Amino acid sequence: MRLDRFLVACAVGGRTEVKNLLKAGRVTVNGKKEKSAKLQIDEERDEIRFDGKVLEYEEFVYYMMNKPKGAISATEDPKHRTVLDLLDDIARSKEVFPAGRLDIDTHGLLLLTNDGQLSHALLSPKRHVDKTYMAQVKGIMTQEDVEIFAKGIPLKDFTCQPAKLEIMSVDSEKNQSQIRVTIAEGKFHQVKRMVAYCGKEVVDLQRLTMGTLILDENLQRGEWRRLTKEELEALLASVD
């Protein structure tokens, strides 16, 4: 691996910044100052230090984002802002992608990673990874709707697996409900279509959980952070 790529992967800085740091003599390889960005290094055997601190290479990275409305769950889009546009240069340099998608007008928990194997496992229909959503609904959800969700709703193109619907609150005067929905699938507009099947309309949708991962309530919309060690270990163990 090239030295500059290694330094970017270790979050020392972006590519331009890394080259300047090398020129400044702030990087050593096996105890010797190194200024060549093109130097080929062995990330497992060579000791690379930045300002005296040993750098450890990480192949995969994992970010939790509180996706805002209006951002596309994609790596690029000609018309809309993408979730990658919300990351800084260092995070984008890791070549991460969204593990699954949230609709443009849906907000909440989104996992960004460059670990294709984990992403595939989380999205595999065979694993039935639960995802929980909070929805504001125009209309009054009822116990009958709870039972309809539990049986599995027959939509036009597929029949939903049994899902859990919890009615959190109902406001008869405003004709609205707040519900919590847990599904093991993630089809296009699925929660909205399930609610529409019951004759109501989702007006706001937020994803709260995906498998063991729970949205950090301290993350504002558009903010992101690395997964904690505990979060990552639990997530990896859940698909092992």
Segments (PLM) and residue ranges:
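Basic, flexible Lys/Arg- and Gly-enriched helix-loop patches that mediate nucleic-acid binding at interfaces
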Residues: M1-D240
